[in-house]
């Protein structure tokens, strides 16, 4: 068997190869900049600011602009003024966005702090720190990326000064002066992500220098680089396993070049990689992105080049160009500013030649909505790791920046979602990264590969067959074992199918991996194939591989997993490299840099002698860290930082969002001259030997000495599983059946499922110790319910592995369902089955039980008895012929589990006696009526079984044979059966084998002449290049299939469809039935409309009548005189059946292999259901004369290629007709011919004469609620649970309002923010702080009279606005008169709604507003019709005239309304008109004269109406509104709050309850049942109400639509008649009718025949049941039969009789 490894694609895989650039919109440009273009540096930025040298003051000023202030910069921008000569260099601090350092030609260096409150104050002239004046001009200023107060400056004396800024002002001193440069220093770079202790510089003397500034002032390495006279610039690329230096310069021919150097191997004068970039003359600067290993090159010119860096290559991805607008400078913004929601990986500022600054974003296209953590690792938080004094004191201290996650709140990471759902495995990601970095390394384990990383095998292996040394009595032997690495453990199994390991060990408990030294290998080749795994406790596992390559792969893989799983503790060097760390793998002498770095470590780390190693093994775990040096960090006082926003170093230790900083000296790295953990190549300088436990081996020779294959000894961990609670999917108590010799026992254990493993413990308290046993669920075969296993109460189920059966018992049915659901997701076959819903990880069972499994069990399994389950595996008691001379028969229990047949002694057995894999069975033969035999592929007997004797009612033997045969067919791998080479599928298909492009299949090749003979191309058919003939055949079962394109296919009994693209012919035989013709015509018409968009012409032809269509006969290759077949007849066709077979091609994600299995088999008499097709698979549908390849949307490319191979093999079968073609279809792009192959495909033709399958999914009729139940709903008051979080505008709420106009959002005038117009729609953005972050709510407000277009526009513009915002955002739809409380709170006591549109608004026109509401938040003014009839004594009204504003207080209006009315009137009083307050009854003539234009003083709902009522009105009762409807099939009563006039629906009955009155507004289209029920409910409610209702104090009135009484309308906000039908105007108000008068008509049950013929019908009569109102005597006279005889007549016939008698 070939060992399984991580596959490497032929095409170079890259996460960023499709990165593209995008310039921001013009409105986000920064313009009107006055830049001193003569300055050496032109542009720098922080997260909040950007700076540029200003031309003001002769270049001695530095202009600062906020990144949030887009647009035109003021003519006099904010500047830093403090130098007398032009500024030559400047740099922002890494720890404070508002701190910047400047250097000038006046030889001064100053540190400034820009005020955070804004840049509108006076210019900044007082620096924070002024350093001592230099002797020569300052050329550069730099901050350390991790160390606080460490500052550097370079001058024209060609030195680099390092300052400690802890002591402020002139006391700041140079603590180190780096010398050795011979010309101007052009750039400086720190190894930010690999320790922060090395410094590289580039100089105009064409040399690069490396410094260890804490050890010496002179360079530890100097190397010549680019030959160009202009010099070069550099940066470090030292994240994600890289440790490189990138330099960008030019050669003598002015060709710009990119070099990659290994800082550990600089003794070679040649770079690792050299790439030509461009011939432009400008100097390019490199910018490194630590998250994606990309390097951007840019400067003065016309673009930005970007490369992806690998260990041995730099891949050019692209160039960002900007047309004719050239740039003067660029700067990379901090990583934390990018928008991860749109996959923006980097953002630059670009200073153009037109003195404007543009933002340029680089984006990586990803479709998923998940957080793409693989390209967005934690970024620097902006806080220091340590300070200057501590860093200089400890020369072994390595520091990296503090990091914080970039994941937005509420978004899942791509690593938190399964691969089946579009997620990624972090483990695989890291291993693939390690694989890329290892390719090309020296040594036998490297695996090779070309320079581009486009080929070669991966050096990593995850599972495979090896041999292990097994101790024997006389000698040891090597036996086959199956080794596998899973997560953080290595497991050794007896074979590949075993579910329980022989031994296992955490990878961190492996001390090292040894191989035998090749130089000492004198005993033969066998030693070169072996490696030893030595554990920390001294235990050793000796393994042997089949090849050296496999041995090397295992050694490197184990070490890679060890490095990747190192805990992030006090020894972490970098959060990016904390999971793995690469050391030097090249067998050359160490560079001076390495010697300097490790000169002290060489004394602390030495290779232990054999005696020392033996002592260490004897000590075991007593002193596991004996070789680990202790931290020697001195204790010093932390000085206060003047630069950092967070000066407290100790506070950072408890900062949960940051990576923990610590000195690396706590666990120092041994010298890099040791062997790499990822390479087993022997170096020339080190050969380590160890002694091992002496054992007797099968070879007489002595093994050569072992060579250590690692560089560090890991810290031992607890040998327990160390399961994290967050990784646990399910856990709980289960009872396991333990068989015994005499009786069985039931043992309770604590089971845990985590990361594909099932662990068992004695109890929960021992969960952190070693488990009793570990079962790999991916090796398990089946998990299903059982019965009659346990004798105690519970719900049993069974987990089956290849060599064991585990019987378990849960306490509840729901608990068992949850366990089965989890177990089945991890089974052996789950990798290719339909994915289940992902369970939420939880620590308790209650949280897991979300949807119990369907089960019809109704008892609690007392005595182990359950009811019959819906799906029971094939199992039972059989007799098996035992092997032996006498061939005896023995009883056994046989169960078919998945694709395996388990034979056990009895049902309670836990170990099967025999396991038969059905994939190895070639024949199941029935020997006798109750005996059958299984044969293998060699026709050898596998097993004989005997069943009970068959009876007339039951044949058990046939049942077993049919069940086993079906399972055997499903187990066959079609790929192997057809002899398809799976490796060929992984390579690109040749063009001759490519399926042609068709419709939605644009990613395939264009069809060639050969393609059209083998494939059906839907596009070619549409264009007329291909033609097909379709037959519609059958009588009882009409079927559609494709036949040969020839006149010989025609039959006089059938219809045929000739699809010629632009023309579709329908030819009907002379004896074709009408049903057959109808289906053919319908099918052809569907092709025309659905597939051709109605552009094809439909031509109908009948045999013997329309024979002059020469085109039809020409296409078929014949003429109308050709004889037409008369056989087979429709009856004979019905006896025919065409076999249909569906194969499913799946990808087993667990084994990374393809599987093609039989999914369905039958004939066209019983078609499969569409649900068999799953989007994650590809299906090959074989219909004998047609072959379809159906491609699921979520299937992989290799699945699609394999399906094509399977289809081609099927097409090439000998018994296949030569005109069979293959059609490729994508999901949702199926053609009509394919849909006809399924029974229930949407859009299938309904014409069929066969009996349809009876489904059990018929909706059951609902039971009507009792009147008392509906009435009780009205007694429960409505409670508004909306929590208030908004802040009104007047109190500081941040609100922005837009109005929708011409499909765009237009800024609403700010002074009208609380005023809206009923014919407009709006978007209101509210911004607030949530958890110290900005959050947003977008309300899109739909005016009551706004158009549908405006309402739709507001919705999609809200989505656009949401996408442009940063932070949490919620979208809320707000409808007029039903506004939510938080929206109203924004405009508290200010909100006004005017009639009409804003553009037509005339503030001088007289208008009337109704002020209504329950409290200050709910109160608002709504404009009503300008008529005195709209006044309401219950509320306040505002009358606005050009001369004066009147506030009219209704006699019974609320105080809150009266107070708010004044505030509202002042709000829209734009003309400063006087305001007069009037009370009802004391109005002036001037007030009433304002209404003269609309009829003057009219009747309105006044105090007299209330006082004259016989029933007193309650003014404290809140009106309530209910809707009574039977839309759901039964009568329901629901409360609406808030309610409005728009809730009145003519198809329902609406109930308005104001306590003193209850109005029933009966819609004209409400059903009879609803009307009657609503009246009965109200009357019952009054009798049972505890809210103050009673028959004496509550009057129930019926209101008619469009004739509502004035009292009814007065309780609605701003009642209007604008939406009334024109035939109902002018209004006629009618008083309400007492409900008792109406209800008595509905309760009347008997009417005469003459009364039922009246038009209109009597009130209360149900027009659909007129026959039920006749008494028995009249009924017999009218219908001439009794009611009993009437009910026996079918319903459809009864309707016809009723129509004849006009009772309908």
From Swiss-Prot:
GO biological process, one term: actin polymerization or depolymerization
Gly residues bias: start-end ranges: 442-456
WD repeats: 82-122, 133-173, 180-221, 225-271
Domain HP: 1641-1704
Spans of repeat Gelsolin-like: 1025-1119, 1138-1241, 1293-1390, 1404-1494, 1520-1615
UniProt entry keywords in alphabetical sequence: Cytoplasm, Cytoskeleton, Membrane, Repeat, WD repeat
Cellular localisation: Membrane; Cytoplasm, Cytoskeleton
GO cellular component, one term: Golgi apparatus
Chain segments annotated as transmembrane: none
Region Disordered: start-end pairs: 439-460, 606-721, 848-877
Composition bias type Low complexity, residue spans: 613-636, 651-701, 709-721
GO molecular function, one term: phosphatidylinositol-4,5-bisphosphate binding
All copies of domain PH, residue ranges: 459-563, 727-828, 871-969
Membrane topology classification: Peripheral membrane protein
Record has Repeat as a keyword: yes
Sequence ranges of Acidic residues compositional bias: 854-873
PROSITE patterns: HP, PH_DOMAIN, WD_REPEATS_1, WD_REPEATS_2, WD_REPEATS_REGION
Its biological purpose: May function as a linker between membranes and the actin cytoskeleton.
PANTHER family attached to this UniProt entry: VILLIDIN (PTHR11977:SF125), VILLIN (PTHR11977)
Protein name per UniProt: Villidin
